[in-house]
């Protein structure tokens, strides 16, 4: 989102106190809508986690909508968002528009059960975590062990949220696995495929 800063439109609101201008994302945040658009990294993670916690503070029971169009990114950054989604008391609906890959698909399936949505032309990609390391052989071995544990934990959580066996998830994550919106629904990544907001209401 930061790369589009110069393209973000402003919304003008009139009130008894005068005229106020908001960027479109701040305006949508007032409606409890959060966007993840692009790569997931520490900056995006900090922003999304802060928005989730702020909205929970405003109203701990009202739904938050998280819209995702992301190729994935840093695993630890994604886990920070995942844990915060589970931590807050608000239900969190997730909506895939465009593409949810890797950590993007992981966050998509982490929404509140019954509130995980894909738009009809969305594409979802699952695969195992990626990593590359340099250094001493002993350090490379430790990194390899760590990424193996991360892969195992991700498979456990996919199985938990999607209603699949651990073994099936592990096989699916072994290679790039693309899904249509309907295939993602069948697999348990999302609960619904909606083409209009009226159907989601």
Curated annotation (Swiss-Prot):
The keyword Aminoacyl-tRNA synthetase does not apply. Its EC number is 3.4.21.92. GO terms for molecular function: ATP-dependent peptidase activity; ATPase binding; serine-type endopeptidase activity. The active site is at 102 (nucleophile), 127. The keyword Hydrolase applies. Keywords: Cytoplasm, Hydrolase, Protease, Serine protease. GO terms for biological process: protein quality control for misfolded or incompletely synthesized proteins. Transmembrane segments: none annotated. One of its GO terms (cellular component) is endopeptidase Clp complex. It catalyses: Hydrolysis of proteins to small peptides in the presence of ATP and magnesium. alpha-casein is the usual test substrate. In the absence of ATP, only oligopeptides shorter than five residues are hydrolyzed (such as succinyl-Leu-Tyr-|-NHMec, and Leu-Tyr-Leu-|-Tyr-Trp, in which cleavage of the -Tyr-|-Leu- and -Tyr-|-Trp bonds also occurs). Its main location: cytoplasm. It is found in: Cytoplasm. Pfam families: CLP_protease. SUPFAM superfamilies: ClpP/crotonase (SSF52096). Gene3D superfamilies: 2-enoyl-CoA Hydratase, Chain A, domain 1. Fourteen ClpP subunits assemble into 2 heptameric rings which stack back to back to give a disk-like structure with a central cavity, resembling the structure of eukaryotic proteasomes. Cleaves peptides in various proteins in a process that requires ATP hydrolysis. Has a chymotrypsin-like activity. Plays a major role in the degradation of misfolded proteins. Belongs to the peptidase S14 family. This is ATP-dependent Clp protease proteolytic subunit 1. It comes from Mesorhizobium japonicum (strain LMG 29417 / CECT 9101 / MAFF 303099) (Mesorhizobium loti (strain MAFF 303099)). The gene is clpP1.
């Amino acid at each position: 989102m930061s790369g589009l800063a110069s393209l973000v439109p402003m919304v003008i609101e009139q009130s008894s106190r005068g005229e106020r201008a908001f960027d479109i994302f701040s305006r949508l945040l007032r409606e409890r809508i959060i966007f993840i658009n692009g790569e997931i990294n520490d900056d995006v993670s900090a922003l999304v986690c802060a928005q989730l916690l702020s909205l929970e503070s405003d109203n701990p029971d009202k739904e938050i909508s998280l819209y995702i169009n992301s190729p994935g990114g840093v695993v630890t950054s994604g886990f920070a968002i995942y844990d915060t989604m589970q931590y807050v008391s608000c239900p969190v609906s997730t909506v895939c528009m465009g593409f949810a890959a890797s950590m993007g698909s992981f966050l998509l399936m982490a929404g509140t059960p019954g509130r995980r949505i894909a738009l009809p032309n969305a594409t979802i990609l699952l695969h195992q975590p990626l990593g590359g390391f340099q250094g001493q052989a002993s350090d490379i071995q430790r990194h390899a062990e760590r990424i193996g544990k991360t892969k195992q934990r991700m498979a456990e959580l996919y199985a938990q949220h999607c209603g699949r066996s651990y073994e099936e998830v592990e096989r699916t994550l072994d290679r790039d696995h693309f899904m249509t919106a309907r295939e993602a629904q069948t697999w348990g990544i999302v609960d619904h495929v909606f083409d209009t907001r009226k159907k989601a209401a």
